[in-house]
């Protein structure tokens, strides 16, 4: 954020000490266990939703929130339900070329970390799929940038989540014909990922449609 950037500059000039720098850094994070910067870690969180290995809307819910605790419980139930003792859904059978394309489209549409060029190639290789930088360049050329998240703007991942987050993004990418809506996920298909979680009256997780309009067009815009 601007204040953290200012303090870093002042520290580099020798005008403030390490204590002031640490105070500014700590104040930039909303809760323990979070990273507001849309770098490698959060880009991978986005990818996990795009390939359907996350529960819908789970990527950017903060630690310590009641919703995060409920999502953790629900994820445990889902992991058990798709294990060998239930509706067996191994990742090796679920992830295919459509999943990888969806991941790359998500990366380009959100302006994610360039480190994902390496991460996604490795991820694809583990599924027996060859993904090259040229493949990513060709996908990038036809994928609109729908998000502006720090460091591409002053807004962090929490602002992105509040503006509509992954549910809104996935729905827009499907609407634009930019992703494979039929790619398999732990929830069914990618089309089933275009949802946002909330806690129902019984304290359990429920899902609803994402908002029809972006909460902030400077951060997250529709595909058309």
Regions found by a protein language model. Give the residues of each.
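Catalytic or ion-coupling anion/metal-binding cores of large enzyme and transporter domains
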Residues: 1-224
